[in-house]
UniProtKB/Swiss-Prot annotation:
Lineage: superkingdom: Eukaryota
Source organism of the structure: Licuala grandis (Ruffled fan palm)
Similarity-based family: Belongs to the ATPase alpha/beta chains family.
PROSITE patterns for this protein: ATPASE_ALPHA_BETA
SMART domains named among the record's database cross-references: AAA
Protein name as catalogued: ATP synthase subunit beta, chloroplastic
A Pfam entry, by short name: ATP-synt_ab
Key words, A-Z: ATP synthesis, ATP-binding, CF(1), Chloroplast, Hydrogen ion transport, Ion transport, Membrane, Nucleotide-binding, Plastid, Thylakoid, Translocase, Transport
One GO-annotated biological process of the protein: proton motive force-driven mitochondrial ATP synthesis
GO MF assignments: ATP binding; ATP hydrolysis activity; proton-transporting ATP synthase activity, rotational mechanism
Gene Ontology CC: chloroplast thylakoid membrane; mitochondrion; proton-transporting ATP synthase complex
EC number(s) from the headed UniProt entry: 7.1.2.2
Localization, UniProt: Plastid, Chloroplast thylakoid membrane
UniProt-annotated binding residues for ATP: 172-179
Length: 498
């Protein structure tokens, strides 16, 4: 797919400098601008307002054209606060959509929606930039082969595998390990696939964005000493930003990811946290533009906006963008138009469980609630499919027996059920795994477990070959050989204590 590198964001040529308009009306973050006859800007063009406010402060506001109103008027949405703007101020049409820096120079840095660095680490190389509005890859460019994107995380690869170039919904409340899971995925794609990641913080808390940045520096995902060796670029448009910025920051992150896929031919992970806020910002902008609201007050263009973002996230013959999107479900109502529209685009869901987190099972991925369209025998093979189904059946049976165990105890179960419970508890613990990015907190080295090793481990547990090992031997280990070695160490320790 061709990317047109352009000069840095809005630089105005002498020809375009003549295309000046004036502010006619300001309604919060929305501006109406009058242009000379025949000089109307295109939809999505970036407009720049420069000048000084009443107290002499410098103003530099970038807007995006959303509507052509007639009578030489356009309606534009501001990407930053409109404080200090006045009617009659001069507006420059840049003649092109917003363009942001792309390429290796973006790694390890934090950007806003305009592609400007906001981390106080100096300017970014802007020789290569790309417009944020582009069409999705043509069908002929797509890679139609279904293949699994191996993450090295046992519970994900076995029970809810990710599709290469697919879209995954990440569900989980606060404090269940969403951030750590995201950082581990960023780490693993860099090590195993030679890929990079782009994180789009869409409408979330500024504090959370800062915490993520600090944790990434601590875990080595962002390399402070050599910023070029970092594995991720961050793009933030947080809760305090105007709706225009929150609506477009996802596209800024996606544009950076597309460059790594199309030009560098890499596998890219694109994180969007939170996809619901993207819809919410679009709803605010839609109301400000005077459009008639649709179901539950959402914008009438909800499906179109979501589709134009999601269709650009795909595998091409050059590389892939695999997207992991945190999904906030308002009032836990899955039928709400925002999450319902998102679900239609997802290939897999990873559900984090507070119950598992409370038990200390990390990653706290729920093996029964997490799903994937990839878990089919024709895609993953009979061996993988059979193993995954037996793991789920064993876990489900254990879940059903928990009430009986709580009331009557284990002794009242049949011999077969007791064996099922013992194996299910081993499986539950074996689904936990030490993470590379958590080494600094736990002290235990991280483990990347290949898919073949993962399947072999669970087959051995299900076959009963490891029934004699204590269940704590399976907790926070990598492959099954580590579990057997840990069991031997535990046995030696217990003998020494005696």
């Amino acid at each position: 797919m061709r990317i047109n590198p352009t000069t840095s964001s809005p630089v105005v040529s002498t020809l375009e400098e003549k295309n000046l308009g004036r502010i006619a009306q300001i309604i919060g973050p929305v501006l109406d601008v009058v242009f000379p006859p025949g000089k109307m800007p295109n939809i999505y063009n970036a407009l720049v307002v420069k000048g000084r406010d009443t107290v002499g402060q410098q103003i530099n506001v970038t807007c995006e054209v959303q509507q052509l109103l007639g009578n030489n008027r356009v309606r534009a949405v501001a990407m930053s606060a409109t404080d200090g703007l006045m009617r009659g101020m001069e507006v420059i049409d840049t003649g092109a959509p917003l363009s942001v820096p792309v390429g290796g120079a973006t790694l390890g840095r934090i950007f806003n929606v305009l592609g400007e660095p906001v981390d106080n680490l100096g300017p970014v190389d802007t020789r290569t930039t790309s417009p944020i509005h582009r069409s999705a890859p043509a069908f002929i460019q797509l890679d139609t082969k279904l293949s699994i994107f191996e993450t090295g995380i046992k519970v994900v690869d076995l029970l809810a595998p990710y599709r290469r170039g697919g879209k995954i919904g990440l569900f989980g409340g606060a404090g269940v390990g969403k951030t750590v899971l995201i950082m581990e995925l960023i780490n693993n794609i860099a090590k195993a696939h030679g890929g990079v990641s782009v994180f789009g913080g869409v409408g979330e808390r500024t504090r959370e964005g800062n915490d993520l940045y600090m944790e990434m520096k601590e875990s080595g995902v962002i390399n402070e000493k050599n910023i070029a060796e970092s594995k991720v670029a961050l793009v933030y448009g947080q809760m305090n930003e105007p709706p225009g910025a929150r609506m477009r920051v996802g596209l800024t992150a996606l544009t950076m990811a597309e460059y790594f896929r199309d030009v560098n031919e890499q596998d890219v992970l694109l994180f969007i946290d939170n996809i619901f806020r993207f819809v919410q910002a679009g709803s605010e902008v839609s109301a400000l533009l005077g459009r008639m609201p649709s179901a539950v007050g959402y914008q009438p263009t909800l499906s179109t906006e979501m589709g134009s973002l999601q269709e650009r996230i795909t595998s091409t013959k050059e590389g892939s963008i695999t997207s992991i999107q945190a999904v906030y479900v308002p009032a836990d109502d899955l039928t709400d138009p925002a999450p319902a529209t998102t679900f239609s685009h997802l290939d897999a869901t990873t559900v984090l469980s507070r119950v598992l987190a409370a038990k200390g099972i990390y990653p706290a991925v729920d093996p029964l609630d997490s799903t994937s369209t990839m878990l089919q025998p024709r895609i993953v093979g009979e061996e993988h499919y059979e193993t995954a189904q037996r793991v789920k059946q064993t876990s489900q049976r254990y879940k059903e027996l928990q009430d009986i165990i709580a009331i009557l105890g284990l002794d009242e179960l049949s011999e077969e059920d007791r064996l099922t419970v013992a194996r299910a508890r081993k499986i539950e613990r074996f689904l936990s795994q030490p993470f590379f990015v958590a080494e600094v907190f736990t002290g235990s080295p991280g483990k990347y477990v290949g898919l073949g090793e993962t399947i072999r481990g669970f087959q051995l547990i299900l076959s009963g070959e490891l029934d004699g090992l204590p269940e704590q031997a399976f907790y926070l280990v990598g492959n099954i050989d580590e579990a057997t070695a840990k069991a031997m160490n535990l046995e030696v320790e217990s003998k020494l204590k005696k």
